[in-house]
Curated annotation (Swiss-Prot):
Protein's recorded name: L-aspartate oxidase
Keyword flag ATP-binding: no
Catalytic activity field: L-aspartate + O2 = iminosuccinate + H2O2; fumarate + L-aspartate = iminosuccinate + succinate
Note: The chemistry is similar to that of typical amino acid oxidases in which the transfer of the hydride from C2 of L-aspartate to FAD is rate-limiting and occurs in a concerted manner with respect to deprotonation of the alpha-amine. NadB may have structurally evolved from succinate dehydrogenase/fumarate reductase-type enzymes to gain the new functionality of oxidizing amino acids while retaining the ability to reduce fumarate.
Site (Important in orienting the L-aspartate substrate): 121
Regulation: Inhibited by the product iminoaspartate. Competitively inhibited by mesotartrate. NAD acts as a competitive inhibitor to FAD. Inhibited by iodoacetic acid, diethylpyrocarbonate and tetranitromethane.
Gene assigned in the entry: nadB
Assembly behavior: Monomer. Homodimer. Both the monomeric and dimeric forms of the enzyme are catalytically active.
Length: 540
């Protein structure tokens, strides 16, 4: 029997990072918006982003140059239209962020005029990265959170996970297949609630938690990708998971990122004996794209049997380092490492999901009323490798374009008054929570070993066999026991793990972030790896 939902709104946004909150603020003057946040509202990847946002603000730079740099970094399979769409709208979307109160670093030019301080990162041919010292994400997130919490038309539900999307045909509604809301796990009450919405937006971030080592916060469990797949959406390019080259190697800070901007400002990568190695791998040295740098570090670690490599900027003046990287300097100092005096131990770690749910220029998915923006989506911008500081930019541009489309379509959106409640009549409390913990550790370990920086066909086949066994265990557990946060995340992440492996098995070449010893060369013609629910297939 259908009942009135516990929550109802015009637009439900699942995720509270730069993508979700920028969209919420653009919509809220005209629409009622609910934002779901899995943890505290600031606990997402945006808050921890150090580098900055790429946009053309320098008169010596150009949109064409930004486009070409992105296409080169994407290793030949970016969607040129998407790249041009993002680059051409970058400045206006960054200006909107500035208008919201975000403070980027400035400096005084030789002519006495003040301008934004632009830094350069790997893959960029010009200085075009706007930043707030070395904590850009924190500045962006805290500004947007403050605006959202004070807007009368935005409700932020913290500690609330989406369990699954409610799709019309699965609950017996007639007409075109569309999304009508979501079931939501209230972590405070430990109950599943119903939320009706005329439009639903996935802004859930990526899936790097599928790997043992990651720079991401604990919530990056691929929820949006898995829910969209179950709802009937296509996904693409999930074999391209970016491994950030420089995560801190330290037992007390295993997911701490050392920003690309350090290398942009002259830091060197060194072996334990103090010698540089990046010039041996790429003429751009430390400023090569991330996939090349990560593989080089991985290669040197395995060749030397070393636990880590080192990042060294101690040749720069100490005042320069403290001024440009105050957060990193203080963090490392607290761990007994002086960035101004010594090299920092680093390893690669899973950082960014370049593929995701297939969308158009407005973030629309294959299901009517369902949008996906930010890291959860596949727009074609990143291709086989994301260029530094294009990720926050993608969040802003598609937050704007999705808002335009949602507003345009809202007068014609379907409205319903009742939805089926969550059915717990045939489940009981879990009796063996240790099973979930064991499955967590097993999944993340074999994904790191078999589907990491370097892959083989045999490793992928082994991973898929283990994923299939885990899925059977998890599905049985999900069917018989009440949901929990760990169970929901594990169910989603093992689904995304399968999609990652299936995409990787499709690609019979090494391109960008996907490197396999069995197919080390590039194919002459290639394109995105696309999976469709019900029948896995390649569309290139």
């Amino acid at each position: 029997m259908n009942t009135l939902p516990e929550h109802s709104c015009d637009v439900l946004i699942i995720g509270s990072g730069a993508a979700g909150l920028s969209l919420a603020l653009r919509l809220a003057d005209q629409h009622q918006v609910i934002v779901l946040s899995k943890g505290p509202v600031t606990e997402g990847s945006t808050f921890y982003a150090q580098g900055g946002i790429a946009a053309v603000f320098d008169e010596t730079d150009s949109i064409d140059s930004h486009v070409e740099d992105t296409l080169i970094a994407g290793a030949g399979i970016c969607d040129r239209h998407a790249v041009e769409f993002v680059a051409s709208n970058a400045r206006s979307c960054v200006q909107w962020l500035i208008d919201q109160g975000v403070l980027f670093d400035t400096h005084i030019q030789p002519n006495g005029e003040e301008s934004y301080h632009l830094t350069r990162e790997g893959g960029h041919s010009h200085r075009r990265i706007l930043h707030a010292a070395d904590a850009t994400g924190r500045e962006v997130e805290t500004t947007l959170v403050s605006k959202a919490l004070n807007h009368p038309n935005i409700r932020v539900l913290e500690r609330s996970n989406a369990v699954d999307l409610i799709v019309s045909d699965k609950i017996g509604l007639p007409g075109t297949r569309r999304v009508v809301g979501a079931w939501v796990w209230n972590r405070n009450k430990e109950t599943v609630e119903t939320c009706h919405a005329k439009a639903v937006v996935l802004a859930t971030g990526g899936a790097s938690k599928v790997y043992q080592y990651t720079t991401n916060p604990d919530i990056s469990s691929g929820d949006g990708i898995a829910m969209a797949w179950r709802a009937g959406c296509r996904v693409a390019n999930l074999e391209f998971n970016q491994f950030h080259p420089t995560a801190l190697y330290h037992p007390q800070a295993r997911n701490f990122l050392l920003t690309e901007a350090l290398r942009g400002e002259g830091a060197y990568l060194k072996r334990p004996d103090g010698t540089r190695f990046m010039p041996d791998f790429d003429e751009r040295g430390e400023l090569a794209p991330r996939d090349i740098v990560a593989r080089a570090i991985d290669h040197e670690m395995k060749r030397l049997g070393a636990d880590c490599m080192f990042l060294d900027i101690s040749h720069k003046p100490a005042d320069f380092i403290r001024q440009h990287f105050p957060m990193i300097y203080e963090k490392l100092l607290g761990l007994g490492i002086d960035l101004t005096q010594e090299p920092v131990p680093i390893v690669p770690a899973a950082h960014y999901t370049c593929g995701g749910v297939m969308v158009d220029d407005h973030g629309r998915t294959d299901v009517e009323g369902l949008y996906a923006i930010g890291e959860v989506s596949y727009t074609g911008l990143h291709g086989a490798n994301r260029m530094a500081s294009n990720s926050l930019l993608e969040c802003l541009v598609y937050g704007w374009s999705a808002a335009e489309d949602i507003t345009r379509r809202m007068p014609y959106a379907h409205d319903i008054s009742t939805l089926p409640p969550w059915d717990e009549s045939r489940v009981e409390n879990p009796d063996e929570r240790v099973v979930i913990q064991h499955n967590w550790h097993e999944l993340r370990l074999f994904m790191w070993d078999y589907v990491g920086i370097v892959r083989t066909t045999k490793r992928l086949e082994r991973a898929l066999r283990r994923i299939t066994m885990l899925q059977q265990e998890i599905d049985e557990y999900y069917a018989h026991f009440r949901v929990s946060n760990n169970l929901l995340e594990l169910r989603n992440l093992v689904q995304v793990a399968e999609l990652i492996v299936r995409c990787a098995m499709m690609r019979k070449e090494s391109r960008g972030l996907h490197f396999t010893l069995d197919y080390p060369e590039l194919l002459t013609h290639s394109g995105p790896s696309i999976l469709s629910p019900g029948n896995h297939y390649i569309n290139r």
